[in-house]
Amino acid sequence: MNPLWSMSAGSVRKRAEGEEKTLAGDVKTSPPRSAPKKQLPSIPKNALPIAKPTSPAPAAQSTNGTHASYGPFYLEYSLLAEFTLVVKQKLPGVYVQPSYRSALVWFGVIFIRHGLYQDGVFKFTVYIPDNYPDGDCPRLLFDIPVFHPLVDPTSGELDVKRAFAKWRRNHNHIWQVLMYARRVFYKIDTTSPLNPEAAVLYEKDIQLFKSKVVDSVKVCTARLFDQPKIEDPYAISFSPWNPSVHDEAREKMLTQKKPDEQHNKSVHVAGLSWVKPGSVQPFSKEEKTVAT
């Protein structure tokens, strides 16, 4: 080992020990000072105690998960959007009209044009949950119970939950319920029926089933002019044919309007231009001066 390295290392250790002693000797500790006790000012007489601030109350939530202050507007907007979708779908033979008194109640009627229930006219009412679209599926009740496996023979309610076991927001819509109500009259399903008699007859005795269906259609037709079950200005009601009232409306519906497109195509409408007809030079068209 090089002796110079050992000497230098030893001198470094001694220098470090000397510096530590010097630093230790320079440090002086002062005795702790006793801080004066803090005293609160005396409470004046007849002073009321200070109440603790209360935390703000949680914002009220409506049943559909929105803030209670704008919950009704959100519900109204949702139902308006649903009715717009119904109009756009143009379901054949299905007509609906929201109630005047409540947007959660819709009146409707279904016209069946062929099949086992041909010539059937079935009025119904749709009841929408007040927490729509976060609740269960809407309910659909026929004004007169129709003889059908999926219609309750007492209440006239259609088994809507069969098709919508869980109502999914932004995925299921009311127009789908209306389409389902129309489809059940063309495609009969007898599994887990609400009317067991109708299901058994459809499977075992189709002729007797058809006979009961015809009777049910006749009953609904005979009571078509009855007053609506719910008193509402927008409830759907039928009245006998009155030529003085209905002939004019019938002619308007049957008369086809002449298309205006052909007339517009034949008429040439000149637009603004600064090119003289027959010339390709820009700004060749002379401007007409107005006499003053």
Curated annotation (Swiss-Prot):
Pfam families: UQ_con. It comes from the Eukaryota. Ubiquitous. Highest expression in kidney, testis and brain and lowest in spleen and liver. It is found in: Cytoplasm; Cell membrane. It is a peripheral membrane protein. Residues 14-23 have a biased composition (Basic and acidic residues). The modification Phosphoserine is found at S30. InterPro entries: Ub_conjugating_enzyme, UBQ-conjugat_E2_core, UBQ-conjugating_enzyme/RWD. SMART domains: UBCc (SM00212). Coiled coil: none annotated. GO terms for biological process: apoptotic process; early endosome to late endosome transport; endosome organization; endosome to lysosome transport; lysosome organization; protein localization to perinuclear region of cytoplasm; protein transport. Residues 1-63 are annotated as: Disordered. SUPFAM superfamilies: UBC-like (SSF54495). One of its GO terms (cellular component) is FHF complex. Its main location: cytoplasm. Belongs to the ubiquitin-conjugating enzyme family. FTS subfamily. Component of the FTS/Hook/FHIP complex (FHF complex). The FHF complex may function to promote vesicle trafficking and/or fusion via the homotypic vesicular protein sorting complex (the HOPS complex). Regulates apoptosis by enhancing phosphorylation and activation of AKT1. Increases release of TNFSF6 via the AKT1/GSK3B/NFATC1 signaling cascade. FHF complex promotes the distribution of AP-4 complex to the perinuclear area of the cell. Component of the FTS/Hook/FHIP complex (FHF complex), composed of AKTIP/FTS, FHIP1B, and one or more members of the Hook family of proteins HOOK1, HOOK2, and HOOK3. Interacts directly with HOOK1, HOOK2 and HOOK3. The FHF complex associates with the homotypic vesicular sorting complex (the HOPS complex). Also interacts with AKT1. May interact with FHIP1A. This is AKT-interacting protein.
